[in-house]
Amino acid sequence: MLKTSEAAADVLKPVLVFDSGIGGLTVLREARVLMPERGFIYVADDAGFPYGGWEEEALKTRILSLFETLLQDYSPEVCIIACNTAFTLAGADLRARFPDMTFVGTVPAIKPAAERTRSGLVSVLATPGTVKRAYTRDLIQSFATQCHVRLVGSENLARMAESWIRGEPVSDEAVLAEIEPCFIDSDGKRTDIVVLACTHYPFMANVFRRLAPWPVDWLDPAEAIARRARHLVPLPQDAEHPDGFDFAVFTSGKPDFATRRLMQGFGLSVSSN
């Protein structure tokens, strides 16, 4: 595993994918399909997980400090912030602090939801931090004023998703309690789209579908985020996938066995850094 400063000068710079935990793997999976020539570094701030309960200024300071180190160590081509909470809070500050770096953000997919809905009833399933952020409400004001948008902030679902991804049991009753507020049945109309505004949630989409009181479109933004990154990352002629990258970094420095095994399933070794 290489830091960019240790790599040969002609090696393609890696793509850095950042999340509070392991939910950003949904974005990594799509990005790899579109950028096979690039190495990937997945950074999980598991020492700070979950982000939903943090005070805003403290979390913003933490994220900016982490990126001071990450950009110095790995000099990526682009950084994908695969976390709605992190980007809606600190995205503008990251771009201002590091103007030479390209950041691709993750925001609630409210615009495509508003374009697709037939009933006009859309729900946004997110963390409490994303729900209360002015950024989210600005998206609604800009793109969805013709819809009724319900914001559902789940305190527990990101943790449940982390457990579920690792193969640990999560009860149907507990999951249903988190997603049930998304479903509105009013005046002969029903919610027909639920925006998954946390990158952890798509891992549980099949569980959501099974438990939902009626079928809806569960909108996963991962592919759109990956397409945006592909658009911004140059594709050199005769590019070959570099050796030494494709690893995960955990800010705790101590991912458990189940997490290491999960990373291997995504083709990532775990950095000892």
UniProtKB/Swiss-Prot annotation:
Protein's organism: Agrobacterium fabrum (strain C58 / ATCC 33970) (Agrobacterium tumefaciens (strain C58))
Name used for this protein in its record:
Glutamate racemase
Q: Which enzyme type, at the first EC level?
A: isomerase
Biochemical pathway: Cell wall biogenesis; peptidoglycan biosynthesis
GO biological process, any: cell wall organization
Give the function comment from the record: Provides the (R)-glutamate required for cell wall biosynthesis.
Q: Report which reactions are catalysed by this protein.
A: L-glutamate = D-glutamate
Q: Where does substrate bind?
A: 19-20, 51-52, 84-85, 199-200
| Keyword vocabulary terms for this entry | Cell shape, Cell wall biogenesis/degradation, Isomerase, Peptidoglycan synthesis
Q: What is its EC number?
A: 5.1.1.3
GO molecular function ontology, one term from the record: glutamate racemase activity
Which gene name belongs to this protein? murI
What PANTHER family does this protein map onto? GLUTAMATE RACEMASE
